[in-house]
Amino acid sequence: MPTTDHFSRQAALYRASRPDYPPELFSFLADVAPAGDLALDCATGNGQAALGLARHFAEVVAADLSPAQLAQRRPHPRVRYVAAIAEQLPIADRSVDLVTVAQALHWLDLPAFFAEIRRIARPGAVIAAWTYGLAQVTPAVDNVVARLYTDIVGAYWPPERALVESGYRDLPFPFEPIQAAPLSLRADWPLDRLIGYLGSWSAVQRCKDATGSDPVASVRDALAAAWGGAASRTVVWPLALRVGRAAR
């Protein structure tokens, strides 16, 4: 089954509102990869993870099926963007040191994708996939976000979202496990940035399509009251990370 595109229509919002991944994540992956020649970021979107990889690898190929997402790409001299689905990659056999999938593995055709990874991976190459769940701000803000997530747009999440909710624990991952230290995404955001992030959820877009109204607007006042008078607050997303090694 081909990969589904959930984010093209909100590509600009996605780029503007998604949090950055911690630099320690990319340092760790570079340390465990067998070499630093070529990294591949699948379902790259606008290249958010690809730029983190570019600090450590001589070349990064960043692939995505969405022309709208690639139009928002972040240029870098060591990053080459390609329009391709993750299950059919324009990459030579046994050429890649590291494969990453950031916040997207649950959308892929996993058997086809894993077969493609076995084809392109060098002996001992590393495969890493990560996801993050709901933002954590304060108990009051978190309660409003949880109400939006569950009560208001809960029916509009695709079934694959359950893999995110389990932190990818229930996702098949047929590679030799590599243990990683716990990591989190952290950002100091104003309230408007959090609201933009909530608007980038795929379920919010599906709810808009079905109802004609903006579900985030329905909780804006409650979010503002819970947020209080702070100009910005620290937002935290615990990262769920699966890392493995291909056959040597």
Residue map of PLM features:
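Conserved alpha-helix/loop element of class I SAM-dependent methyltransferases that forms part
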Residues: 19-37
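A short acidic, Gly/Pro-enriched loop at the edge of an enzyme's catalytic core
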Residues: 87-98
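Short catalytic micro-motifs in class I SAM-dependent methyltransferases
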Residues: 103
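Conserved Class I S-adenosyl-L-methionine
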Residues: 166-248
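Conserved catalytic/acceptor-binding region of the Class I
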Residues: 118, 122-187
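Class I SAM-dependent methyltransferase SAM/SAH-binding core
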Residues: 38-40, 46-88
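Class I SAM-dependent methyltransferase Rossmann-like catalytic core
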Residues: 8-19
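A short, conserved alpha-helix within the catalytic core of class I
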Residues: 108-116
